[in-house]
Each structure stands twice: as structure tokens, then as C-alpha cells.
């Protein structure tokens, strides 16, 4: 279904092309371009894209992302000093960080979003494929293990993380629609 919808297929193709053209995270302008595209196509709500780009550049993530280092997700998601002013708290951009890492290394990084979360929770309630709490989905190490449990339970080992993600997202979007749907 995902690849049959031209909107999603072409968006994925565009992001793949962009990340192939700018695979490194050395130049702020390259990082800013990638952030802006992910932010627009995935509605990740990063209003301070320049600040996030500088943050990612300072982290020097290229070697770690290629190696599939799980800690990179949290490093990107936090420590950027993008503050929610009304409560004076740094925002956690976990969902964005999973997407940014995924587009650099789709074999080692899965994408987290509300649709994936709702789908995994619903499947676990019905089939008990893994022992997890809702908060575990926002811990990338645990999230990745939950996805492995899902793959094993449903005999999906021939499918990669990207294919599993697309299924979870499409299922969640269809079965757990939000009040606001971006076209």
C-alpha cells in the first residue's frame, strides 16, 4: 500500500536522493537541507532548524551512524537547547532523531512516530508479542528490541526495518487517525 501511493513513494525517493547527495554531516548547510526536508515531509515540528543543524554538526555523528550506534538517536534528540518557552524545558525530538538516523542508515535505525507507537501497542495488546510499557517505545534501545520481538512473533524476519516501519505507519494512519491529517 505504501509504495502504491505516489505521494509517499515519491517523498521517499526524494529523501533517498537528498541523503545520497549529502551523506555527511560536516556542513551546516547540508544538514539544514536534510532537516528541512524531513521536517516538512514528516511534520516533525522543529521550528529552530538552524539550531538543530548546528547541534548535529557539533555531534560529529557520521562514523557512529554508519556503525549503527544506538546512542546517536538520544544525542540528536536532546542537548540542542531548543526550549519550549511556556514551561522553560528543552524539547525532546526523539521522533525526528529516529527519522534522521534512519535516512542515513536504514538497516540499523527504525522510525518512531505516533502511528508506529499506536500500532505496536494495539498489536501487543492483542497478541502479547513483547513485554513493554508505552514509555519503552521512546527508549531507542528498547524500541529496537520491541521491533525485533514483533518481527520474530509474526515471522517477519525476511523484512527489513524500513518495510516493518512502513507497515506499522500505514496501519496506524488507517486505524488510528489523528484529528489533523497533513495531505
Model-derived features with residue positions:
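Short hydrophobic alpha-helical segments that form membrane-spanning helices or hydrophobic packing faces
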Residues: 96-101
Amino acid at each position: 500500500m505504501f509504495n502504491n501511493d505516489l505521494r509517499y513513494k515519491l517523498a521517499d525517493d526524494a529523501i533517498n536522493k537528498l541523503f545520497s547527495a549529502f551523506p555527511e554531516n560536516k556542513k551546516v548547510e547540508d544538514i539544514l537541507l536534510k532537516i528541512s526536508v524531513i521536517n516538512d515531509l514528516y511534520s516533525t515540528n522543529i521550528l529552530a532548524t538552524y539550531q538543530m543543524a548546528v547541534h548535529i554538526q557539533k555531534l560529529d555523528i557520521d562514523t557512529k551512524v554508519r556503525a549503527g550506534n544506538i546512542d546517536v538517536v538520544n544525542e540528536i534528540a536532546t542537548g540542542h537547547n531548543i526550549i519550549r518557552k511556556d514551561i522553560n524545558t528543552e524539547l525532546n525530538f526523539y521522533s525526528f532523531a529516529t527519522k534522521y538516523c534512519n535516512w542515513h542508515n536504514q538497516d540499523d535505525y527504525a522510525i518512531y512516530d505516533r502511528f508506529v507507537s499506536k500500532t505496536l501497542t494495539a498489536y501487543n495488546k492483542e497478541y502479547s508479542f513483547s513485554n513493554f510499557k508505552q514509555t519503552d517505545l521512546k527508549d531507542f534501545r528498547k524500541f529496537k528490541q520491541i521491533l525485533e520481538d514483533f518481527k520474530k512473533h509474526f515471522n517477519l524476519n525476511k523484512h527489513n526495518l524500513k518495510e516493518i516501519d512502513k507497515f506499522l505507519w500505514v496501519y496506524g494512519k488507517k486505524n488510528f487517525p489523528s484529528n489533523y491529517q497533513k495531505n
